[in-house]
Amino acid sequence: MNSISIFADSEFDGVRIDKYLSVVFPDLSRSFIQKAIDCGNVSVNGKTVAKNYKLKTDERIEYIPLEPVKLEVKAQNIPLDIVYEDDDLLVVNKPKGMVVHPAPGNYENTLVNALLFHCKDSLSGINGVLRPGIVHRIDKDTSGLLIVAKNDFSHRALAEQIKAHSFTREYRAVTIGHLKESSGRVVAPIGRNPKDRKKMAVTDKNSKNAVTNYEVLREYRGYSLLKLRLETGRTHQIRVHMAYLGHPIAGDFVYGTPRTKEELALNGQCLHAGLIGFIHPRTNEYLEFTSDLPLYFKKFIGGLTVDE
């Protein structure tokens, strides 16, 4: 495959090579670019470099695109709870326990498999074969609303809104214990946990700014029901921030320790994405959608004792 040669402009002096390439090739994900670097397909002045290499002005970068891997994600007739749909996008209410997109070792029964059956070829291709239409994600064991793009125009416009933090995203969660304040704003950067790379953590190292607003709606014996609104959308943000405050989400095996059989029965965090708002990419109209608390959530809080 032919290589691509480019020279680093002065504005990118000191910028990491992987970040630079993600700007030059906006349709490639950062993880795809990092894989190309790790495979030796990126060189600077004739020498292969690590993904954290920092560029200098006028250095010559050569990129050899990775050979495409032929992956076929099959369409599956899995029921979808579609809240809204038009020619550009759809809003889906994802159930707890469903993975959003395929990944190594898990290529079936995901939201993407269901979308491929429902939408056929009408999904954006920006995020590649494994993530068609996927603009943003919520965790497997988080239920609630997701936006799916049907074409690249919509995908780019929605992605820009996410980048600008102009999406409205509101969640409900049950957390362990009672918070000191009835409402608050958590401003704490989130990055990979240096001791466990599979987890995120509040850290100053290689982290991104993260802001979560919360309001206590009701207190139960040993638990609290919260409304949370995101200003940013980092991986596991709500789960990490609540654990950081000392009040992990009920049922969260990763950032907390489920204490009761009722928590264990949740099979993951008691967290629901109940509201999402955005500007429609084609009409420029603000749209907002809500989702009622699902059965697992209602059942859990129904078994709690309200604090008087």
Describe each model-derived feature in a short phrase.
Residues 46, 65, 240, 258-259:
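Conserved "cap/hinge" positions at secondary-structure junctions
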Residues 250-281, 287:
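RNA substrate-recognition surfaces in RNA-acting enzymes
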Residues 128-160, 167-168, 172, 187, ...:
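The conserved catalytic core of RNA pseudouridine synthases
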Residues 78, 198-203, 261-265:
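Short, P/G- and charge-enriched loop/turn segments at secondary-structure junctions
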Residues 1-185, 189-191, 296-300:
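RNA pseudouridine synthases
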Residues 82, 175, 213-216, 249:
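Conserved hydrophobic positions within beta-strands
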Residues 31, 202, 254:
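A short, aromatic/hydrophobic, helix- or strand-capping loop or linear motif
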